[in-house]
Regions:
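GST-like domain detector, emphasizing the conserved glutathione-binding G-site
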Residues: 1-67, 107, 113, 182-185, ...
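Long, positively charged, glycine-interspersed low-complexity recognition regions
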Residues: 144-204
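Small-side-chain structural scaffolding
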Residues: 3, 13, 20-22, 90, ...
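GST-like fold's C-terminal all-alpha helical module
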Residues: 31-153, 157
Length: 204
């Protein structure tokens, strides 16, 4: 809507092939990493704490009020959260996203996902990668995919991003006793890579 209404600055590639690739990536982001990031957000982001404090009756009442999220809320234990397998499954989806982003940066030459221009592809996936870094799970890409760290650093310093992520908007600022920021959950990312023989490239 915003892209169509405010045409002064376009965030869609001019080249039709590149634009098609961007659209395919937008569908991918909606279907895979967007739902997947909920798991670590609830488990490590302080969001689980409010459920732990609830009675079972109140928790079930909350579920009834949010029918679109019923399946998600019933997928974890309100007192302990998600299983390690569920958490690792979410990591696999995020890592698949990282791998795809890395390939796009290589294919289109960077510095942005679709090439020289910042597009809807960057805008769509930035909140997911920023959230994972804020949770302390940036170990998923820091070593195996340094291109993502460079991309994220650049994207986070755009004026529009700085306005969007105002002071107090990140989970590490809302729940500082729980969420410690970049690198703080390295034991989880290290364990994940150990389980999968330290070869993130094989998890596609």
């Amino acid at each position: 809507y915003l892209e169509d209404k405010y045409t002064q600055t376009s965030f869609r590639p001019v080249d039709h092939y590149v634009r098609g690739q961007m659209r395919a990536f937008l569908v991918f982001v909606d279907v895979w990493p967007t739902p997947a990031v909920r798991t670590p957000s609830f488990q490590f982001g302080g969001l689980l704490e409010k459920f732990i404090a609830m009675s079972d009756k109140k928790f079930l009442s909350l579920i009834k009020k949010r029918p679109l999220k019923t399946e998600f809320y019933l997928s974890f234990d309100k007192n302990t959260g998600f299983t390690t397998e569920q958490i690792f499954n979410s990591f696999t989806v995020i890592l698949r996203t990282i791998k795809r982003m890395d390939a796009m940066l290589t294919k289109f030459g960077g510095p942005w996902l679709m090439g020289q221009e910042y597009t809807l592809a960057d805008i769509a996936v930035l909140p997911l990668i920023d959230r994972m870094q804020d949770l302390g799970l940036d170990g998923l890409w820091e070593e195996p995919y340094p291109s993502i760290s460079k991309w994220l650093y650049k994207a986070q310093r755009r004026p529009a991003t700085l306005k969007s992520y105002f002071q107090g908007s990140r989970l590490s600022e809302q729940f500082p006793k729980i969420v410690k920021g970049p690198g703080s959950l390295s034991e989880w990312t290290n364990k994940y890579f150990q389980v999968y023989r330290g070869n993130p490239q094989s998890r596609s």
